A protein has these predicted regions:
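Surface-exposed, short loops/turns at beta-strand junctions within beta-sandwich domains
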Residues: 25-34
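Extracellular recognition modules
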Residues: 37-41, 263-265
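Extracellular carbohydrate-recognition regions
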Residues: 49-88
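Short carbohydrate-recognition loop motifs
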Residues: 99-120, 124
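Solvent-exposed strand-to-loop "edge" motifs in beta-rich extracellular domains
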Residues: 112-116, 144-146, 157-163, 170-177, ...
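Extended extracellular/luminal ectodomain segments enriched in beta-structured repeat modules
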Residues: 146-155, 160, 164-166, 181, ...
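Extracellular carbohydrate recognition and processing domains
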Residues: 195-256
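Extracellular carbohydrate recognition
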Residues: 237, 254-257, 269-292
Length: 292
């Protein structure tokens, strides 16, 4: 009896923050949901072949945005969410169920920046709980997720309207703002955390701000992989478009076992925690799914 092991090959590179990351090489390894053909050859001649289907990948909970009862769409309903939340509290229009040409199904999510107490409140949608008290909002990032396969990308539909910064003072570290142009952002992160990571934003300076493209570990535990999309211009036309955001791995081998293992975040302004961005930015998102 002969056996064979199929393992992915990885391409190593350095990201913009100078950190080493890895991406799987297409055509190597076995990935969820894909079909494969295996052949046995002797002296260059195929003597046996077989096809097999890898087990299906995982579903992102309510990634189709079809349920109007999701906590992210309500006002002050994200404090105990089990997956999708938003900053809807002092203002209720940061995340709403909506419709848009090109969406999948009957509904999508609409994120829209608002003015709250004279400051920018970026439209947002995230896998986090959210609590608003004493004029401050606390987003606690991280949801339990039982990983069974490594994704190569996050696929979704989106449409963004992005303008120039017109609210707030640009922070010192502002590489995501170029020539005064705001940027929206979508990211997905595989983490191995023992607790949620809290980011607090209010009338003063934010605390707990983090960027998965700049760190492979937080106080809560390792950041295993991330995918990030910065959107610096308005999407052409009126219809949503499909995008695949590649996942880059800091750690190629560890399977997350922590209490909190997934973060997805969408915001109309990359520096929304600092109350900096364009009042007028709008982003529609729908049909979140993994690519393997």
């Amino acid at each position: 009896i002969y056996t064979a092991t199929f393992t992915a090959q990885w391409k190593e590179s350095v990201n913009a923050a100078g950190l080493t990351v890895h991406t799987p090489v297409a055509g190597t390894g076995v990935f969820a949901g894909n079909s494969y053909e295996a052949r046995a050859a002797l002296d260059g001649e195929t003597v046996s072949s077989a096809e097999f289907q890898a087990a299906a990948g995982q579903v992102i909970p309510d990634g189709d945005m079809e349920s109007g009862s999701l906590p992210c769409f309500g006002k002050s309903t994200s404090e105990s969410t089990t997956f999708w939340g938003s900053g809807n509290a002092a203002t209720s229009g940061l995340c709403a169920q909506s419709t848009k040409p090109g969406m999948g199904g009957s509904y999508c999510a609409k994120l829209e920046s608002q003015s709250a107490f004279g400051l920018l409140a970026a439209g947002n949608l995230f896998s986090a709980t959210f609590r608003f008290a004493s004029l401050s909002g606390t987003a606690s990032f991280g949801m339990p997720y039982q990983w069974t396969a490594r994704p190569t990308a996050l696929r979704l539909k989106y449409h963004a309207t992005v303008g120039a910064v017109n609210k707030g003072t640009v922070p010192e570290e502002h590489e995501y703002i170029q020539d005064g142009q705001d940027r929206s952002r979508i990211f997905a992160v595989i983490v191995d955390w023992n607790s949620r990571h809290a980011t607090v934003a209010g009338m003063g300076s934010p605390t707990g701000v983090w960027d998965p493209a700049k760190t492979a570990e937080t106080a809560e535990g390792p950041v295993i992989a991330y995918g990030s999309l910065l959107i610096g211009e308005t999407t052409p036309g009126d219809a949503m478009t499909t995008v695949e955001i590649p996942i880059e791995y800091y750690d190629r081998t560890t399977k997350p076992t922590g209490a909190y293992t997934l973060v997805i975040s969408c915001t109309t302004s990359a520096y929304g925690d600092f109350k900096v961005g364009c009042l007028g930015n709008v982003m529609y998102v729908d049909d979140f799914e993994w690519v393997y």
